[in-house]
């Protein structure tokens, strides 16, 4: 258990997870139960701090629509398949959360009432006020939009203070830190600089939406245990993208 501050610096947060994050170190499996359980344990600490939390997860561990389109698949069909992959991941997270006592609801942008509620903004807000964790599935429900853009939309709709983007590296760098040992990490950077330098934080649509609505983005390393709680507690890690 990680305890930093009694009062978190953010009251409502949208956490964006990649689908690949659920794979953990087991690249032979789409979903690693140990990794999902580790994420759930950190989420419980966040809930115990009194933070209101929404989650958007990608589907790239199961299916990547952009890659399928590049190989000849119709883009609309490929994107819908990717959206369905996010539903699978959302249900995996819900199961892990509820197993350790986190009251959770999944809302889907594509109607599938047998397994998830439809996305209704007022209902999502009501769940959050009752201290339920919200998992938003199926992206925006429309092709040609990424799950990063979906995360920004949901963050604005639930009036989140910040969108926390979980990654495999410590923050935003001037170039790929995996390929270049001299890559420099930014502590703070503006939306406009991210767009001008074509830094791979989120797609341009998502970054522009954040800029237009003054929604800060905190980019951090999910692979370091305790980092979700550190971010919410105001510990200076990662990169903050803002005005």
Swiss-Prot record:
Molecular function GO terms recorded: ATP binding; UMP kinase activity
Database matches in InterPro entries: AceGlu_kinase-like_sf, Asp/Glu/Uridylate_kinase, Uridylate_kinase, Uridylate_kinase_bac
GO terms (BP aspect): 'de novo' CTP biosynthetic process; UDP biosynthetic process
Transmembrane spans: none
Class in the EC hierarchy, top level: transferase
Notes on how activity is controlled: Inhibited by UTP.
UniProt subcellular location: Cytoplasm
Catalyses which reaction(s): UMP + ATP = UDP + ADP
Main location class: cytoplasm
Superkingdom of source: Bacteria
Family classification: Belongs to the UMP kinase family.
Family matches, as PANTHER family: URIDYLATE KINASE, URIDYLATE KINASE PUMPKIN, CHLOROPLASTIC
Matches recorded under NCBIfam families: pyrH_bact
Oligomer status and interactors: Homohexamer.
Record's function text: Catalyzes the reversible phosphorylation of UMP to UDP.
HAMAP family found in the cross-reference section: PyrH_B
Record-given protein name: Uridylate kinase
Organism: Syntrophus aciditrophicus (strain SB)
Lineage: Bacteria, Pseudomonadati, Thermodesulfobacteriota, Syntrophia, Syntrophales
């Amino acid at each position: 258990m990680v305890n930093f501050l009694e009062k978190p610096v953010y009251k409502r947060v949208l956490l964006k997870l990649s689908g690949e994050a659920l794979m953990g170190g087991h690249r032979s499996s789409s979903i690693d139960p140990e990794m999902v359980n580790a994420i759930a344990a950190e989420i419980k600490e966040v809930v115990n701090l009194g933070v209101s939390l929404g989650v958007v997860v990608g589907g790239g561990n199961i299916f990547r629509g952009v890659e399928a389109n590049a190989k000849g698949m119709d883009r609309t069909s490929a994107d819908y398949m990717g959206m369905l992959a996010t539903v699978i991941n959302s249900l995996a997270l819900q199961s892990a959360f509820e197993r350790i006592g986190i009251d959770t609801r999944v809302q889907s942008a594509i109607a599938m009432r047998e397994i998830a509620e439809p996305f209704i903004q007022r209902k999502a807000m009501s769940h959050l006020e009752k201290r339920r964790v919200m998992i938003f599935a199926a992206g925006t429900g429309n092709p040609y939009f990424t799950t990063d853009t979906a995360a920004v939309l949901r963050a604005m709709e639930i009036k989140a203070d910040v969108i926390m983007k979980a990654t495999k590296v410590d923050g935003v760098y001037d170039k790929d830190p995996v390929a270049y040992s001299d890559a420099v990490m930014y502590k703070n950077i503006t939306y406009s600089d991210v767009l001008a330098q074509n830094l791979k934080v989120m797609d341009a649509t998502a970054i522009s939406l954040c800029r237009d609505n003054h929604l800060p983005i905190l980019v951090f390393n999910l692979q370091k245990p305790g980092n979700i709680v550190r971010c919410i507690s105001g510990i200076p890690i990662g990169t903050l993208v803002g005005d």
